[in-house]
Amino acid sequence: MPSNPTRKGRVVVGMSGGVDSSVTAWLLKQQGYEVVGLFMKNWEDDDDSEYCSTRQDLLDAASVADLVGVEFEYVNFAAEYKDRVFAEFLREYSAGRTPNPDVLCNAEIKFKAFLDHAMALGAEHIATGHYARVRTVETPAGPRHQLLKALDDTKDQSYFLHRLNQVQLARTLFPLGELRKTEVRRIAHEIGLHNAAKKDSTGICFIGERPFREFLNRYLPSEPGPILTPEGQRVGTHHGLSFYTLGQRKGLGVGGVKGRQRDDGTAEAWYAARKDLARNVLYVVQGHDHPWLLSAQLQAQDASWIAGEPPAAGAYGAKTRYRQADAACRLDQAGGERFALAFEQAQWAVTPGQSAVLYDGEVCLGGGIII
């Protein structure tokens, strides 16, 4: 790809040390932007932990910035992260819900604290390695910015970005939105990035690769209680309701309990189906398609709409978890901070605390927190 000598302004790229943000920085420099790479440290604890890769990620990001030939800076947002993201994460788990901190991190840290910092550095835009696109359309009220799904639907991250607003989208560039992951890795190899084959990060950002129960146990009290079937039969003891999410199959500790069997005589798998916080009871059911695991509708709160106002009632697509295919649904009401969805086909393991995100084709409209 030839370099474009025409300067397009200053852009600060959030560089994590991974291949996506590294290629993002390179692409923008080739397009003629004055690029500044910024590494964000969002978690202070456990820097010496075997699970924490912050130091190596910082070294990787700095090395890439040097190779690409861009300015590189470091900022510590750990205090903001604990206050705006982690505290809410713990509150949600304490209430028996299963939050998605990456959604909140994007809205509060990567596209708020980071954006403010970048503007203070004299930037006109920020950029990240997210797989998504921004489109600006003219309306009678003026230009409106839309969040679109990425070209690579296997990597599309619009679900995690659905709480962004017009101001944030107006300042944001997503260079990878038109590329497939295979192309990104190919570019990284061609330009000699040492992290071209680096594994994508997985799991919740501040937990990393450590066992989830081990991490959560340090911050929330665990109160064991009964595991019951819908009929009230006790089939085990849970370690604390916070450690379980609806639809969970592994780690329930009820595998040896007899119950429904398949045609071949083997027992059907058990799934976490409901939580009763008042009684500290975890309900489990057998079979992936048990009625307790299926929901024909949902209610959501804390709604956030990218256009600044809710869409009209009507037919849309919705995701209730990342990488789920859009489920045909009807938006029945969207007033204030709440909305309701009715699905054409019942959805599996709709989980309170997760995000319900609404789409009109490739356009992400926004969403809310499932209750």
From Swiss-Prot:
Region Interaction with tRNA: start-end pairs: 155-157, 321-322
Keyword RNA-binding: yes
Region (Interaction with target base in tRNA): 100-102
One Pfam family here: tRNA_Me_trans_C
Record key words, sorted: ATP-binding, Cytoplasm, Disulfide bond, Nucleotide-binding, RNA-binding, Transferase, tRNA processing, tRNA-binding
Enzyme class: transferase
A GO biological process held by the record: tRNA wobble position uridine thiolation
Record's GO cellular component terms: cytoplasm
Site (Interaction with tRNA): 130, 354
GO MF terms, alphabetically ordered: ATP binding; tRNA binding; tRNA-uridine 2-sulfurtransferase activity
Chain positions recorded as ATP binding sites: 14-21, 40, 129
Superkingdom of this protein's organism: Bacteria
Catalytic activity annotation: S-sulfanyl-L-cysteinyl-[protein] + uridine(34) in tRNA + AH2 + ATP = 2-thiouridine(34) in tRNA + L-cysteinyl-[protein] + A + AMP + diphosphate + H(+)
CDD domains: MnmA_TRMU-like
Active-site residues, Swiss-Prot/TrEMBL: 105, 205
Stated family: Belongs to the MnmA/TRMU family.
UniProt function note: Catalyzes the 2-thiolation of uridine at the wobble position (U34) of tRNA, leading to the formation of s(2)U34.
Protein name: tRNA-specific 2-thiouridylase MnmA
